[in-house]
């Protein structure tokens, strides 16, 4: 009963305070219900998570609602109210990227139409790089070995013909011995076969380094290009599909290079040589059949493969979708478990697999049709040539050895022809895979240095940040900041407060140059941030975000990520300053403990301390704390705030605190309150509380009242527990 009474007072106080805000906010009536526009988009943003240990009644009635401002609502559902408020038409920066995704994808589609010829041309730059003599020598040597292997390979049927013709004697006569010339021909036959294989393997070994270097360079340059793309581009992409596209693209490069050097060029050379030999040895009729066969075979293969290409594209699309679903599910494993949505995601993944299966079945069926057609064309030609050869032997124009030579030459073409079909097929598929990779490289880098960027260094600090009439929106339509102007003083602690979606976190993104403003300027020490060198600007800014991004590596390596070149002594020092030493001492593996993917193996407070250690190591002159303590309990929050004050409140650094919890910023030298993308008010904590109609004052009163009631509830809980124990 004690706790229940406190809870009811908590609900009533929350209700009355919300109604106080309604005096300065709008209320939208929808039917017999009322949608409330509140400065915060959900209940927890009005204070701490007050209902974490208490249950919220599904509905509550209050006559106060009916009397206040003529509102006619008699029964307001808390969940509906929370949902309604969160859907209020405030510029929501958390969801602003959804609209930009469509625009981004449209832009990408227009910008990255790449032909297969263009892909091969771009790839050739890596096979024949300018100024790299070693690679060029390897390529030329590989081509020489290729030609040598094919010349020896064509000689094999001639040696075999001579052996057959040389055997055309009466071996029943005991006086007949194996001629020395025939023995030499047999040896040459064996050497030619072995030489062709040896030259081919040497070619493979020599060209392997060229191919792998090309793959390495393309992959590295693609990765570096992706790292340069703006934040909006990355937020509009699914990581699983992106990594799968890169993986398939690099494999496609490997196949294209091997196909070009090991198959297409050798096959073309061998077909030309065989046609020439047949024309010279046996007349134009044999060469004509051979040439016609090659032509029909190639046309059929190319047209059928072009028809099959769309099935491969469908399979790739389904594969990307499945990979994205799987990766998202694994990354958000906890959320999946919290909401018991394993079956939903399994079904979603299953649907992607079904689409992939159907596409792959079509690929296999069309492959069977292609192989059958190729075999029909080749077998028909071979049968016709054998008939002509047999007719020539019977007529005395050809020897048995000539018939064997024709058969060997044509059969020798069957292997490269079969390869030609599969190579062209795989080449087309690899080019499709490579197209996705090369498309990534064609995306425009929007945030770039100007022609003559200015440097920024510690000697220029402390830094003043100034926004001059800044307007910005993530999708170009809904504006998050609207003609906003304010100054963050140098070397002081400045806080930015306001409702969700008012543009608080956008301030950080614009200063850091994740984005550039549509209108106005962002100045650091009087210089537009667009005039600074991007790398130097970002080195001067340290960020402790609400959800610290950690790598699946050790604590030591995650801290070291703040400044890779830092010494062990420096890393140890910042670990001590961030009060991580006690945690590390308790761990069996100490600082070598793996934190898990995204830091899931350590608590929220420990993650934030690790983030503080990381930015301490970076030693930036401008510090942003973006809701750094909002996800922590009160005790951990206060402990972390003491650590932050101890390390960052000197006059040497400019500190900016973005916060919903106003208690955490009450000691700030300046507080800037944003509302709907504009500056509502600014001043110190005491100055803002002293003002009439102050938004900050209203928010402060609500949070303070809720904090007091939370303390009362906790006290009543403790009292009840003591009573239970005494009983």
Swiss-Prot record:
Keyword annotations from UniProtKB, A to Z: ATP-binding, Membrane, Mitochondrion, Mitochondrion inner membrane, Nucleotide-binding, Transit peptide, Translocase, Transmembrane, Transmembrane helix, Transport
Stretches assigned to the Mitochondrial intermembrane side: 161-183, 281, 388-402
Gene Ontology CC annotation, any one: mitochondrial inner membrane
Compartment(s): Mitochondrion inner membrane
GO MF, any single term: ABC-type transporter activity
PROSITE patterns given in the database record: ABC_TM1F, ABC_TRANSPORTER_1, ABC_TRANSPORTER_2
Residues at which ATP binds: 474, 498-509
Topology in membrane: Multi-pass membrane protein
Basic and acidic residues compositional bias, start-end: 90-107
EC number: 7.-.-.-
Residues binding glutathione, per UniProt: 308-312, 371-374, 421
Domain ABC transporter as annotated: residue spans: 465-701
Region annotation (Disordered) ranges: 87-107
ABC transmembrane type-1 domain span: 139-429
Mitochondrial matrix face residues: 26-138, 208-256, 303-368, 425-727
GO biological process: intracellular iron ion homeostasis; iron-sulfur cluster assembly; iron-sulfur cluster export from the mitochondrion
Transit peptide: 1-25
Class in the EC hierarchy, top level: translocase
Segments passing through the bilayer: 139-160, 184-207, 257-280, 282-302, 369-387, 403-424
Keyword Transmembrane helix: yes
Function in brief: Performs an essential function in the generation of cytoplasmic iron-sulfur proteins by mediating the ATP-dependent export of Fe/S cluster precursors synthesized by NFS1 and other mitochondrial proteins. Hydrolyzes ATP. Binds glutathione and may function by transporting a glutathione-conjugated iron-sulfur compound.
Assembly: Homodimer.
Family to which the UniProt record says this protein belongs: Belongs to the ABC transporter superfamily. ABCB family. Heavy Metal importer (TC 3.A.1.210) subfamily.
Protein name: Iron-sulfur clusters transporter ATM1, mitochondrial
């Amino acid at each position: 009963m004690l706790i229940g009474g406190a809870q009811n007072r908590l609900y009533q106080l929350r209700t009355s305070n919300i109604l106080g805000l309604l005096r300065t906010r709008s209320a939208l009536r929808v039917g017999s219900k009322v949608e409330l526009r509140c400065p915060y988009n959900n209940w927890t943003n009005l204070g701490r998570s007050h209902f974490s240990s208490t249950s919220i009644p599904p509905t509550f009635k209050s006559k106060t609602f009916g009397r206040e401002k003529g509102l006619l609502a008699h029964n307001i559902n808390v969940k509906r109210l929370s949902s309604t408020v969160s859907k209020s038409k405030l510029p929501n920066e958390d969801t602003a990227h959804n609209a930009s995704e469509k625009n981004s994808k449209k832009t990408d589609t227009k910008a990255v139409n790449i032909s297969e010829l263009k892909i091969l041309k771009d790839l050739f730059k890596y096979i024949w790089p300018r100024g790299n003599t070693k690679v060029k020598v390897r390529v030329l040597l590989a081509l020489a070995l290729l030609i040598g292997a094919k010349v020896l390979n064509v000689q094999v049927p001639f040696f075999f013909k001579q052996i057959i013709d040389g055997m055309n004697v009466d071996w029943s006569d005991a006086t007949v011995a194996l001629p020395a010339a025939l023995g030499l021909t047999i040896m040459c036959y064996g050497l030619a076969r072995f030489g062709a294989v040896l030259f081919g393997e040497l070619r493979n070994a020599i060209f392997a380094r060229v191919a792998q270097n090309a793959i390495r360079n393309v992959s590295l340059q693609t990765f570096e290009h992706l790292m340069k793309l703006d934040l909006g581009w990355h937020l509009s992409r699914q990581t699983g599909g992106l990594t799968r596209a890169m993986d398939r693209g690099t494999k496609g490069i490997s196949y294209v290079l091997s196909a070009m050097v090991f198959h297409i060029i050798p096959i073309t050379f061998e077909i030309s040589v065989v046609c020439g030999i047949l024309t010279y040895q046996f007349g134009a009729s044999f060469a004509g059949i051979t040439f016609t066969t090659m032509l029909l075979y190639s046309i059929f293969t190319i047209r059928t493969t072009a028809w099959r290409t769309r099935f491969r594209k469908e399979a790739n699309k389904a594969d990307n979708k499945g990979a994205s679903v799987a990766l998202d599910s694994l990354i958000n494993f906890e959320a999946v478990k919290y909401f018991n949505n394993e079956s939903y995601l399994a079904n979603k993944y299953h649907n992607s697999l079904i689409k992939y299966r159907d596409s792959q079945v079509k690929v296999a069926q069309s492959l069977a049709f292609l192989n059958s057609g190729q075999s029909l064309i080749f077998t028909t030609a071979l049968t016709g040539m054998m008939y002509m050869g047999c007719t020539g032997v019977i007529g005395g124009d050809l020897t048995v050895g000539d018939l064997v030579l024709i058969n060997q030459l044509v059969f020798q073409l069957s292997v490269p022809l079969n390869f030609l079909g599969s190579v062209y097929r795989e080449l087309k598929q690899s080019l499709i895979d490579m197209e996705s990779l090369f498309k990534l490289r064609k995306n425009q880098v929007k945030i770039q240095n100007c022609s003559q960027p200015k440097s920024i260094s510690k000697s220029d600090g402390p830094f003043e940040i100034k926004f001059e009439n800044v307007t910005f929106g993530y999708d170009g339509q809904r504006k998050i900041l609207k003609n906003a102007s304010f100054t963050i003083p140098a070397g002081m602690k400045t806080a930015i407060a306001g409702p969700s979606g008012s543009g608080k976190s956008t301030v950080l993104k614009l200063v850091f140059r994740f984005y550039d403003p549509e209108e106005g300027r962002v100045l650091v020490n009087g210089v537009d941030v667009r005039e600074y060198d991007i790398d130097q600007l970002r080195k001067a800014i340290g960020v402790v975000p609400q959800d610290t991004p950690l790598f699946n590596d050790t604590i030591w390596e995650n801290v070291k990520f703040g400044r890779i070149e830092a010494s062990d002594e420096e890393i140890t020092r910042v670990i001590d300053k961030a009060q991580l030493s006690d945690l590390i001492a308790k761990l069996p593996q100490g600082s070598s403990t793996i934190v898990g993917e995204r830091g899931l193996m350590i608590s929220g407070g420990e993650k934030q301390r690790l983030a503080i250690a990381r930015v301490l190591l970076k030693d930036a002159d401008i510090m942003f704390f973006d809701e750094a303590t909002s996800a922590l309990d009160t005790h951990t929050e206060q402990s972390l705030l003491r650590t932050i004050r101890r390390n960052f409140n000197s006059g040497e650094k400019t500190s900016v605190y973005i916060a919903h919890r106003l208690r955490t910023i009450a000691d700030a030298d300046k507080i800037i309150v944003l509302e709907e993308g504009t500056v509502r008010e600014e001043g110190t904590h005491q100055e803002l509380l002293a003002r009439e109609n102050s938004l900050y004052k209203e928010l402060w009163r609500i949070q303070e009242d809720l904090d007091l009631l939370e303390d009362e509830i906790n006290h009543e809980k403790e009292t009840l527990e003591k009573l239970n124990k005494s009983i």
